């Protein structure tokens, strides 16, 4: 009789701990931790462009200053991509270039798709 009570109590404790873990998971998943969520909002950068303008004005460049990276280059199409680990730079041929997401394509595949789109084939 005692062993059945111990088993029942053990099963009840196990069930309660699993339920507690589940509720904590859903609470965090759906934003229940309001104090933590509020803390994230106070750490966000301002949504105005003042910080960018300050960096732009403080950059010394006697050539072309790339707007996306603030790199100083000879020509606009020489601007590097802001995120080269996930973007490919494709030169369009008229002295301009675009940075596009690699998106899991094979090397050169994104550039090929842009060329097909420019020709109206895609």
From Swiss-Prot:
Keywords: Signal
GO biological process: ERAD pathway
Signal recorded as keyword: yes
Keyword tRNA processing: no
Cleavable signal peptide: 1-21
Functional summary from the UniProt entry: Probable component of the endoplasmic reticulum-associated degradation (ERAD) pathway.
Identification of the protein by name: Long chronological lifespan protein 2
